[in-house]
Design a protein with these regions (language model features):
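Positively charged n-region of N-terminal signal peptides that target proteins for export
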Residues: 1-6
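Bacterial N-terminal signal peptides
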Residues: 8-18
Length: 362
């Protein structure tokens, strides 16, 4: 009888795994081993149109995942992003990879994927590559704090203009889609216009956690309440909530896009106008006052995960000694602040950002 029950339980677990898209199609982001990718595409044409009017181009993607044989897929690629695409600083823009139907990716590491953001190298220099690695590690740090975060997968990517081109090979990474983040966390994705949701409607623990993360990495390039006019809210954040929650309550912000952070310290990143900082490596807390009540427990979470987060940085062999030492120092200064309750009060609790709903009362 016990054996029958065990078999039934195992069968039920197997059925659940294959019935759940979030579990059945997580191969790409369930492994940390870097992919080997080669993209062959008309990159001269792509670069010519990238700044003004990005259009999709046909491409071939060859990918190797660990010891598995190389697989080749027909895809489309398109320049994406804003600063790195149009700002005149990067020689090469980030890309969007668009796959075909489900059958075209079945049996590959991209099973279940339709579109993916690929973060590329910006400029073909080692220091730029190190900063792309730091962006990748910023995502990994937030994964340590909460599973309600974007997962990323590292890749060594070769970009070729044609089959006879040796190409340029640099570190890059792909980013999980927000719908997959929601499914994986048994949540639903929320979409709304700028200023349609206020800080009072957030899951306050999640909002404090996200706000402290942005402070940790020294990022001021974000807003959880407002975004560009006519675009999905908000600025460098997307949102989910529990599937059974009331509309636009218990909202969980999920930050992304960290190239303007002090943690990365991109050469083109400048401090926002109007804020009392001289450069991006100077931290300023911009989390919302509505979340202050959760901050003591969130600070405790971060302190408890210090060793694990530092290991993410120190155990990555791709980061060179110069950048590792600089990054360790930057992180150590954050944890030194958390160890001092008076500094937490004066540099995090007190300077919090007043939300839209509270702006008339302060």
């Amino acid at each position: 009888m016990r054996m029958i029950k065990a078999l039934l339980a195992a069968l039920a677990a197997l059925v659940w795994t294959f019935a759940s898209p979030a579990l059945a199609e997580s191969r790409l982001f369930s492994d940390d081993a870097p992919l080997q990718m080669t993209i062959t595409a008309p990159f001269r044409d792509l670069l010519r149109t990238a700044k003004t009017k990005p259009v999709p181009y046909p491409a071939t993607l060859a990918v190797t995942d660990g010891a598995a044989p190389a697989q080749t897929l027909a895809i489309q690629i398109k320049a994406r992003g804003l600063t790195r695409r149009t700002g005149g600083y990067c020689d090469f823009p980030p890309l969007q990879l668009a796959f075909g139907d489900k059958a075209s990716v079945h049996g590959t590491v991209f099973k279940g994927q339709r579109k993916l953001k690929l973060v590329t190298y910006c400029r073909d220099f080692n220091d730029f590559e190190q900063r792309i690695m730091l962006e990748y590690l910023a995502y990994r740090l937030y994964n340590v704090i909460t599973p309600v975060s974007y997962r990323v997968r590292a890749a060594e990517v070769t970009y070729r203009k044609d089959a006879g081109d040796a190409g340029t090979t640099r570190f890059g990474y792909v980013i999980e889609e927000i719908d997959d983040v929601a499914d994986r966390n048994h949540s639903k994705r929320l979409t709304f216009a700028s200023k349609a949701v206020t800080a009072a409607q957030f899951d306050q623990h999640a909002a404090a956690r996200a706000g402290l993360f942005e402070f940790m990495i020294g990022n001021l390039d974000w807003d959880f309440e407002a975004g560009p006019a006519g675009a999905e809210c908000c600025h460098n954040a997307r949102f989910v909530a529990a599937r059974d929650t009331q509309p636009l309550s218990g909202v969980v912000p999920i930050p992304y896009d960290f190239d303007y952070s002090g943690f990365v310290d991109s050469p083109y990143a400048g401090a926002p106008i109007g804020l009392p900082v001289d450069n991006v490596t100077q931290r300023l807390y911009r989390g919302y006052c509505a979340s202050n009540g959760e901050m003591p427990s969130v600070v405790a979470e971060y302190r408890a995960h210090r060793a694990e987060m530092m290991a993410v940085i120190d155990n990555d062999p791709r980061l060179n000694p110069k950048f590792r030492a600089k990054t360790d120092h930057f992180m150590d200064s954050f944890f030194a602040l958390l160890d001092d309750p008076a500094r937490v009060q004066s540099q995090i609790i007190k300077p919090c950002r007043v939300g839209i709903a509270d702006s008339g009362r302060r």
